[in-house]
Amino acid sequence: MPDAPADQASVSLLTADLASAHKLMQEGKFDQAIGDLQSLQASHPEAKGLDLELGTAYYKKSDFPKAIEYLKKASAADPNNGEATQLLGLSYYLGGHPAEAIPLLEKVQGWYSRANVDAAYILGICYIQTKDYPRARAAFARMFDVPPDSAAAYMFTARMLLRQEFDPVAEEYAQKAAAVDPKLPLVHFLLGELYLYKSRVPEAIAEFQKELTINPGHAQTYYKLADAYSRIQKFEDAERLLQRSIWLDATSTGPYILMGKVLEKKGEFELAVRALQRAATMDPNNPTTHHLLGQAYRDMGKKEEAESELKLAEQLQSQQSSHP
């Protein structure tokens, strides 16, 4: 067998080249990895698995049409390769083709680290985008290990629908969840958030109050209810609720920022500044906090501090706009 050592050397070289390409991908050098893999494919046309490697590189580069081209070849060559099938499905989804993604993602429901996302979640989103809401609910129920007809399944699906801006269906599903189990924690909070987002303030207030009846230790509900009250100029109620939210959770900046806004509206500028300074310490790069601080200082007649904060807010805003 005179060719055996040469074959072994060729395999070793191929393995080393693949390891090098993987390292380049980990470093984010996708074009270099793709170039090396294409050279490898040209010099080793008989080598298996290179279409999957190239498809993966294009997937990680977010070049989904090219990823689809190579992953289709990889799937055709080995129909039982779950990774190739799942990556092809994800590439279709991320390339804006959810209907093509669904049968592939249905076929492979496991987790593959190469994809770096939960394919079960993506499958649920594909169902939403193709308006197949019952199957979306079944997918999310499976993801969260709850029965598909449970209140929790309806609530999880409502949350995902809201995230995808399918607001009317989200409202319908959240209401269904509340009807199935009116005491399900966070279902009234979700409805309140939805109504607040739609500026349906009285309905939002009613839902947040229901949530507090069954879930009185939830800091976010006090915060969101305070937000609703502040929108109808009920600043005393808003301040009282914000204080409760902060007592329950002093790690969130939102309640401190809203407290600053509420106190400024009440004319309590020094207390407003104190709340906003606390928020700025926790998150120095939030332009809203610095803008509100600038306004509060201006109301107090502190011109230099006001200009400094407003200038900083503008700088942070422009930085965020240039790096979305």
Residue positions per predicted region:
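TPR-adjacent "capping" and linker segments in tetratricopeptide-repeat scaffold/adaptor proteins
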Residues: 2-16, 111-115, 320
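Alpha-helical segment of the N-proximal tetratricopeptide repeat
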Residues: 13-47, 56, 60, 125, ...
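Structural marker of alpha-solenoid helical repeat scaffolds
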Residues: 43, 77, 110-112, 145-146, ...
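Structural signature of tandem alpha-helical TPR/SEL1-like repeats
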Residues: 27-35, 61-73, 95-107, 128-142, ...
